[in-house]
Each structure stands twice: as structure tokens, then as C-alpha cells.
């Protein structure tokens, strides 16, 4: 049997030419860093280095940092990515040249109207949206929301107690995830849900769908290998965000605006209402106010950015406390002394609790939700005396820097004392960046810390946490783009007494 197809000479020539052109496309940019004398891992045709992310970006970045030093080059498909680790370089990218060169993140996947969100918008549009949103995240506005957060802190305690009373080790992800979901939906939309006990609530089910995608899926890999497909997908209205979820939230925002215009009643404070309030006549006439589509995009991105952050970070904090009983005891003591008899904290008192702050900061050092910080250059630029063209992606491997022995003695150890008032002064703000840095840092930083700290206080007022045989020690991290434990965290939870105030 003839295994070689019987093609004409012209067909063979065309096939050979196609293969040559495909190879050239697959490798055309892969000599970029070699010409500049910048070391880095060898890329594969078409894929670049993305297949090395299968064990986790964080793991790959640590290996590269050890092997190549302060700067290296890699490739996401054909896209050159320059990794930098020196604080002066990082400051130049995130702060000094933020508005002139490094304003934007990269546009990698099709996102539809979500391009209007503060996280994904670009240039002057981003500056306008950020300016409109910033007043909603001041400490004054967060204090207005604090009663809502306290309410869900008590729901968290009640849900955890119900599980703990069964006498079995508790899987914490579902409970912490519900806390994160409840707070995000309440503060973003003003809607009360109890997502743990009402998983079929449309808000809960539609919001949960927003997180169901894999960064190494064929769909997303296609945009990495063939960046031009992103524009094609956008033209075809194909997005990484599920259409039914977007449709649901679109209807809700539209209905809320109609009610907002018709009602003179004072609404419970939430981000959606605050954004609608900002649509005043003066700003609308000057085209500075947020449009309806922009308000919708911000509302959805709050869910996307806030949910996984709170649930994963809470899990990592509880793991760290359970495996370091001395730290847990000390934090119990601070909470009991500051808030005797399980008193509710005020916003100001909570934010002044020093050891609580140390524990949260050290956890965010060890387990930053985002592995990397990225900025796309919109002009030619220089770093370290070398010139780079427009379109070079600059990447800061924040996880690798948080675990770098150059800056942190015994970097894999959980030591809250690193963030004491005495030691905090020695921490470089361009090495420790759990929320990024510069004008484009995380706008929800204060909100995230408030949610985490209140949850910690309410949990530790009522419970102690211990490892059990089902606890994975040491904690292994998943390969997901957003950092989280490889397996759901399971701990033994013991009530400190039989009294729960308000729960």
C-alpha cells in the first residue's frame, strides 16, 4: 500500500511553501532577545514558552529568576515578553513612564464590551474611568459599606459553625467562596444573597459562570498563538465571558437604572448606585460621566476581580494560621484584647490592628493572587541602556519576587514579623506588590483588605483552626493563572465557646 499521497508537483510545491510560511510565522519573533543578548528559555515554534506554564506561571518564573538573573526574555506565542526584577526598572515602568509608555495591559483575549472596564480599558478612556471610580473606593465610602460587610461576616460564622458542629474536618473553599460572592454581589449591586444556602439564586449561578475558563484551553491558546484571532473573535461577538451571564447582568443594570430614575427614596449604598449617581448633567454633557455600558462593565469586573481574591486568600490565611499555632494564638490575643466579648469592630479600629495587618500582609507575600504584573509598551523605550520597540510586553514576576531570598530571609517561611512597624520600613514597595503599584494599581485594594480583615476577626473571635490528616502539608499551589491551592483546603475547626454574637 502506498503511504505517500499521489499529489501533483504543483501541490507538493504549494504544500512545502505553506509549511515554510507556517514555520516562519511560528518563529519569526523568536530571535528578538537573542539579538539583544538577553538570556531566556528556548521557545517552541508557534507556542513560544506557554507550555511551560503547565506547572504554574509562578513556578516557571521562579526557575527563570534563578537561572537567568535580573532580566530575561520569553515568548507567549509570537509575543516577546521582557521580564524585569530590579526595583528601579519596575518603578520606571509602573510609575515614571506609566502615562507615556506603559499605560495599558495587554489585550490578549476577546472580551466584548468588558473592554470598557477599568481593568481592561486603555489610555485616555482608562484615565477617565479610573477618575470617575476612585471616589467610590475612599475610606469614607467604605465606611458607609461597612455595615453590609459586617452582616456577611456573621453569615460566614453561622455557615462555618453549622459545618463544624458535624464533628468532621471542614472544606473551607465553599464557605469562603460564598462569603466572597455574597459581599461582592451586595456591594456591587445592592442585592442580598446567601449563596452557600441558595446556590440556584440567579445572581449566584450567573456570577459563578464568569470564572469557568481555563487559560490553557484551546480557545485561549489560539489567541496566544495567533493574536490576530482576537480581533476576529471580537467581530464575531465571541467572548471569554459567557453570553447568558452578561445578558442577565445587562438586564439587571438597566432595570436598576429605571428604578433609580423613578424613585426618590434613598437606596442602600452600593457601587452600582454610586456610579448611577455620578451620571450628572454636567459630566454627561462634557462626556466625562460613565456611560451605561461602562457602568455595566465595572459592575461585572468587580465580581470577576473580587470573588477569587477573597476566597483563595482567606483559605491561605487559615492554612498558615492552622500550621503556625503560635501565630494564631497571638492573633487571637490581639483580637480578644482589642474587641472584648466578641465586640464588633469599627472600620478604624480594625484598620489599626497591627498584628492582624502583619498576618494579612505576610499571607499576601506568600500567596499573591496575581502571579505577574504586565504592561504593554505603546512606544519605543529603553531599559538598562537597551532599546526596545513598541509592542514589547514588560512583565514583573511578582510571585517570584515575593519568594526571592535576596529580599526575604527564608522566603518560603510564614513570618508575620517581616511586616512589623520596625521591619516594614525596609520593605521595598517595588518588590512587595500584592496589589500592583503606580497609577494603575488595584483600585479595590482597600475594599479587599477590609473584607479579609473583617472575616478574620469574626472567624477568630469564634473558632480555632487546626490541621488534620486531610490537610495538604506543605500547601501545593495550582497551575491556574489566579493563584489558589491545588486542592480544596480542609481543616479541623473548633468553636472557642458556645456564644456567637449576632450569628
From Swiss-Prot:
Residues holding heme: 442
Cofactor or coenzyme needed: heme
One GO term (biological process): steroid metabolic process
Induction: P450 can be induced to high levels in liver and other tissues by various foreign compounds, including drugs, pesticides, and carcinogens.
UniProt membrane topology term: Peripheral membrane protein
GO cellular component, as recorded: endoplasmic reticulum membrane
Signal peptide: none
Keywords: Endoplasmic reticulum, Heme, Iron, Membrane, Metal-binding, Microsome, Monooxygenase, Oxidoreductase
Catalytic activity from the UniProt record: an organic molecule + reduced [NADPH--hemoprotein reductase] + O2 = an alcohol + oxidized [NADPH--hemoprotein reductase] + H2O + H(+)
UniProt GO MF annotations: heme binding; iron ion binding; oxidoreductase activity, acting on paired donors, with incorporation or reduction of molecular oxygen, reduced flavin or flavoprotein as one donor, and incorporation of one atom of oxygen; testosterone 6-beta-hydroxylase activity
Function statement: Cytochromes P450 are a group of heme-thiolate monooxygenases. In liver microsomes, this enzyme is involved in an NADPH-dependent electron transport pathway. It oxidizes a variety of structurally unrelated compounds, including steroids, fatty acids, and xenobiotics.
Database matches in PANTHER family: CYTOCHROME P450 3A5, CYTOCHROME P450 FAMILY 3
Identification of the protein by name: Cytochrome P450 3A15
Lineage: Eukaryota, Metazoa, Chordata, Craniata, Vertebrata
Amino acid at each position: 500500500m502506498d503511504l505517500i499521497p499521489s499529489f501533483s508537483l504543483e501541490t507538493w510545491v504549494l504544500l512545502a511553501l505553506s509549511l515554510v510560511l507556517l514555520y516562519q510565522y511560528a518563529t519569526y519573533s523568536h530571535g528578538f532577545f537573542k539579538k539583544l543578548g538577553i538570556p531566556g528559555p528556548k521557545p517552541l515554534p508557534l507556542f513560544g514558552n506557554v507550555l511551560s506554564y503547565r506547572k504554574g506561571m509562578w513556578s516557571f518564573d521562579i526557575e527563570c529568576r534563578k537561572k537567568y538573573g535580573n532580566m530575561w526574555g520569553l515568548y507567549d506565542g509570537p509575543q516577546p515578553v521582557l521580564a524585569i526584577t530590579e526595583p528601579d526598572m519596575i518603578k520606571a515602568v509602573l510609575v515614571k513612564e506609566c502615562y507615556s509608555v506603559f499605560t495599558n495591559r495587554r489585550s490578549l483575549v476577546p472580551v466584548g464590551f468588558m473592554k470598557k472596564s477599568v481593568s481592561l480599558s486603555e489610555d485616555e478612556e482608562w484615565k477617565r474611568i479610573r477618575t470617575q471610580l476612585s471616589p467610590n473606593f475612599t475610606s469614607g465610602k467604605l465606611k458607609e459599606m461597612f455595615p453590609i460587610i459586617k452582616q456577611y461576616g456573621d453569615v460566614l460564622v453561622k455557615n462555618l459553625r453549622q459545618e463544624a458542629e458535624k464533628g468532621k474536618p471542614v472544606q473551607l473553599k465553599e464557605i469562603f467562596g460564598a462569603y466572597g460572592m455574597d459581599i461582592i454581589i451586595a456591594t456591587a449591586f445592592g442585592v442580598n444573597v446567601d449563596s452557600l444556602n441558595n446556590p440556584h439564586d440567579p445572581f449566584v449561578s450567573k456570577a459563578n459562570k464568569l470564572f469557568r475558563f481555563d487559560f490553557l484551553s484551546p480557545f485561549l491558546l489560539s489567541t496566544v498563538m495567533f493574536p490576530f484571532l482576537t480581533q476576529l473573535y471580537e467581530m464575531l461577538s465571541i467572548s471569554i465571558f459567557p453570553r447568558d451571564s452578561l445578558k442577565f447582568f445587562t438586564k439587571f443594570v438597566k432595570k436598576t437604572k429605571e428604578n433609580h430614575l423613578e424613585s426618590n427614596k434613598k437606596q442602600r449604598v452600593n457601587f452600582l448606585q454610586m456610579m448611577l449617581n455620578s451620571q450628572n448633567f454636567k459630566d454627561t454633557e462634557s462626556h466625562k460621566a460613565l456611560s451605561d455600558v461602562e457602568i455595566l462593565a465595572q459592575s461585572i469586573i468587580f465580581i470577576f476581580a473580587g470573588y477569587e481574591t477573597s476566597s483563595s486568600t482567606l483559605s491561605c490565611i487559615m492554612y498558615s494560621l492552622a500550621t503556625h499555632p503560635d501565630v494564631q494564638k497571638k492573633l487571637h490575643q490581639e483580637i480578644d484584647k482589642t474587641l472584648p466579648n466578641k465586640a464588633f469592630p469599627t472600620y478604624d479600629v480594625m484598620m489599626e490592628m497591627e498584628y492582624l495587618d502583619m498576618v494579612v500582609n505576610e499571607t499576601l507575600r506568600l500567596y499573591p493572587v496575581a502571579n505577574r504584573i504586565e504592561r504593554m509598551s505603546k512606544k519605543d523605550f529603553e531599559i538598562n541602556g537597551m532599546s526596545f520597540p513598541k509592542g514589547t510586553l514588560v512583565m514583573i514576576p511578582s510571585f517570584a519576587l515575593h519568594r526571592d531570598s535576596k529580599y526575604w530571609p527564608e522566603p518560603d517561611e510564614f513570618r508575620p514579623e517581616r511586616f512589623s512597624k520596625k521591619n516594614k520600613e525596609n520593605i521595598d514597595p517595588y518588590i512587595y506588590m500584592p496589589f500592583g503599584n503606580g497609577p494603575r494599581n488595584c483600585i479595590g485594594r482597600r475594599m479587599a483588605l477590609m473584607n479579609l480583615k473583617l472575616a478574620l476577626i469574626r472567624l477568630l473571635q469564634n473558632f480555632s483552626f487546626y490541621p488534620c490528616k486531610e490537610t495538604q502539608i506543605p500547601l501545593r499551589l495550582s497551575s491556574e493563572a489566579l493563584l489558589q491551592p491545588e486542592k480544596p483546603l480542609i481543616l479541623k475547626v473548633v468553636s472557642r465557646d458556645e456564644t456567637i454574637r449576632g450569628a
